[in-house]
């Protein structure tokens, strides 16, 4: 959890660059990729963020270190963002890595805005999340930062290559397995969905049922969750015959599972607990 100084530094820096990122056009894609790579490098070389957040070190020295590390390899706006970040105060060194990752996602969202694909990417992330719900071994392997990266990449692409996902969705999905950052894979995907929802000003409601929702059901759920969340919602319908009946509804981290299969599993647990007493 970030301290107050880090939360303030992260928020103020991102707010100050929002307009520039929004207006960066196709550069946002490259900026996002550069910042994801830098997050990875900093996470795996903790001495770098420690040096860049050292309160006893002059900002000019930190900027000089940045220039030595990156030279002219990064785009000017990427360097401008990093220069701003190292000039701020941080509660702990690793928090600057979190801010760089936040900026990377922001850049990808602005790229999606520029291509008018923001909702599409958000829905595809929800589709990826839904596809992984019944694949616990795959989820575990994608989260295993100790395993070979190429194996995780191959596993991910075996799962998504036939889905015709947008390049932004693919890049975000790759980041989640390349650099898990102490998060489980599904946790990372949900974190991204939440970010896209806030960015769009609406909530993503994923509804899993055994058969497709009718228009009436979808409209009713939209009304209920618009009132509940206080903002517009997008209903993402997932058909999974294995749930047998009922609905599984996820909004952010909140899950309400009233499917038949969930009730049967709950009944099994109760029976097992009763037998063992």
Curated annotation (Swiss-Prot):
Signal peptide: none
InterPro entries from the UniProt entry: ATPase_OSCP/d_CS, ATPase_OSCP/dsu
Membrane topology (UniProt): Peripheral membrane protein
Keywords on record: ATP synthesis, Cell membrane, CF(1), Hydrogen ion transport, Ion transport, Membrane, Transport
Keyword set includes Protein biosynthesis: no
One Pfam assignment: OSCP
Record keyword Ion transport present: yes
PROSITE patterns in the record: ATPASE_DELTA (PS00389)
Example of a GO MF term: proton-transporting ATP synthase activity, rotational mechanism
Recorded superkingdom: Bacteria
Chief subcellular location: membrane
UniProt-annotated location(s): Cell membrane
Gene Ontology CC annotation, any one: proton-transporting ATP synthase complex
Function per UniProt: F(1)F(0) ATP synthase produces ATP from ADP in the presence of a proton or sodium gradient. F-type ATPases consist of two structural domains, F(1) containing the extramembraneous catalytic core and F(0) containing the membrane proton channel, linked together by a central stalk and a peripheral stalk. During catalysis, ATP synthesis in the catalytic domain of F(1) is coupled via a rotary mechanism of the central stalk subunits to proton translocation.
Family affiliation: Belongs to the ATPase delta chain family.
Assembly, per entry: F-type ATPases have 2 components, F(1) - the catalytic core - and F(0) - the membrane proton channel. F(1) has five subunits: alpha(3), beta(3), gamma(1), delta(1), epsilon(1). F(0) has three main subunits: a(1), b(2) and c(10-14). The alpha and beta chains form an alternating ring which encloses part of the gamma chain. F(1) is attached to F(0) by a central stalk formed by the gamma and epsilon chains, while a peripheral stalk is formed by the delta and b chains.
Name the UniProt record assigns to this protein: ATP synthase subunit delta
Upper taxonomic lineage: Bacteria, Bacillati, Actinomycetota, Actinomycetes, Bifidobacteriales
